[in-house]
Amino acid sequence: MIPVVALVGRPNVGKSTLFNRLTRTRDALVADFPGLTRDRKYGRAEVEGREFICIDTGGIDGSEEGVETRMAEQSLLAIEEADVVLFMVDARAGLMPADEAIAKHLRSRQKPTFLVANKTDGLDPDQAVSDFYSLGLGEIHPIAASHGRGVTSLLEHVLVPWMDDVDPPEEVDEEAEYWAQFEAEQNGELVEEEEDDFNPQDLPIKLAIVGRPNVGKSTLTNRILGEDRVVVFDMPGTTRDSIYIPMERDGREFVLIDTAGVRKRGKITDVVEKFSVIKTLQAIEDANVVLLVIDAREGISDQDLSLLGFILNSGRSLVIVVNKWDGLSQEVKEEVKETLDYRLGFIDFARVHFISALHGSGVGNLFESVREAYDSSTRRVSTALLTRIMKMAEEDHQPPMVRGRRVKLKYAHAGGYNPPIVVIHGTQVKDLPDSYKRYLMNYFRKSLDVMGTPIRIQFKEGANPFANKRNTLTPNQLRKRKRLIKHIKKSK
């Protein structure tokens, strides 16, 4: 399960600044996530190839009464959900009564907590943080979040030990293997690709059912299972935790993940429901395919788009399900379809299904799209095929000129799966305009017949063999150079 890191502290100690710096590493910020308490933000970040969810819990006012109420309502449950808590203090302001009150609550929770002293730029760190040792939270990590100073050290000493113990792939070795395979195929040699021990067809497809409260997620789960496995009431938020349910359909194993809904801000009254979104985000990360359920009668809301943004940033396969389609007039149905085209036009790779989970209409067709999306996201593609497709795209539409020189695309290989990643090597490829990158992405999608999953394209510059090498003259060139210098001196 992807780890969760919570940022806790008084207002204006720099939590949001650190949050932005952490999440900017992936450019996958989901800020001010609708359905949460005011100023709460969720984002995805990465450190040394390991992903985690970061939560900015908002400020705690610090009065004794305020700590008791605000901590209970906003932060304590976030702390319980988190794997690591970063307790931030202001080194410039010094130790405040609110810091002591917050530290007392954190100590009582017995949650892994690390004290982070922010705003140490221009100060002597040892002297600035000395007062905070009285909080009894052990070592203090001085940083300057606005400038990024000390953040790397914080990540290495605090977050890395809590990440999954999986080393990032050795990119150089993989590329060398792909390049060797490509060279052999170019020379007409018969290349037998090594059999991969991993066969995605042998594993169950993990299917997350997500959406706002009361859109019919649990009803859909029960309809798929054919039994009432999940408690369903006609009121939002009856599901409080993600429920994993194994099942089999048409000889294929699945694991259904029914998640708690994401509710609009201001309508949340039960504190337990406020943090169920963490389970939703973790379920998305854990899933292979995500069913995003939308209420046809309420249309597409900002909460739906925020959840969709997190799914896209996660790179998960996607099937869009428009529920409660029964009983709508033809005129209303046409209006809903127009709204979908307008607001979700950029999601051209996802299948859209119109269903009634309550009555079962259209539910059976979902699994065809789920399997299609899963197969597309896990299919293995050879280097030779990807390079041929890249060359065809280049012939149909040449790359533009950059600083007077044509961008050259050399070869392409697979860089990962679920989502499919295509790595293109060449010269000046990082200067390609976004329009050409989108053209390549769409060309690969059409050529590979990929549906239901996003495709990511990464660009890498080829190494210059003459970089950092000085020109050396041959003996003949040296003699000519001496004669030329003599001639120039005589002419003067």
Curated annotation (Swiss-Prot):
Residues binding GTP 1 are 9-16, 56-60, 118-121
Its BP terms in the Gene Ontology are:
ribosome biogenesis
Domain spans labelled EngA-type G: 3-166, 205-378
User: Record's Gene3D superfamilies?
Assistant: 3.30.300.20, P-loop containing nucleotide triphosphate hydrolases
| Pfam families according to UniProt | KH_dom-like, MMR_HSR1
An example molecular function term from Gene Ontology annotations: GTP binding
Residue stretches making up the KH-like domain: 379-463
The alphabetical list of record keywords is: GTP-binding, Nucleotide-binding, Repeat, Ribosome biogenesis
Q: Which domain of life is it from?
A: Bacteria
Which positions does UniProt annotate for GTP 2 binding? 211-218, 258-262, 323-326
Role played: GTPase that plays an essential role in the late steps of ribosome biogenesis.
The record's subunit annotation is: Associates with the 50S ribosomal subunit.
By sequence similarity, the record places it as follows: Belongs to the TRAFAC class TrmE-Era-EngA-EngB-Septin-like GTPase superfamily. EngA (Der) GTPase family.
Q: State the protein's name.
A: GTPase Der
Originating organism: Cronobacter sakazakii (strain ATCC BAA-894) (Enterobacter sakazakii)
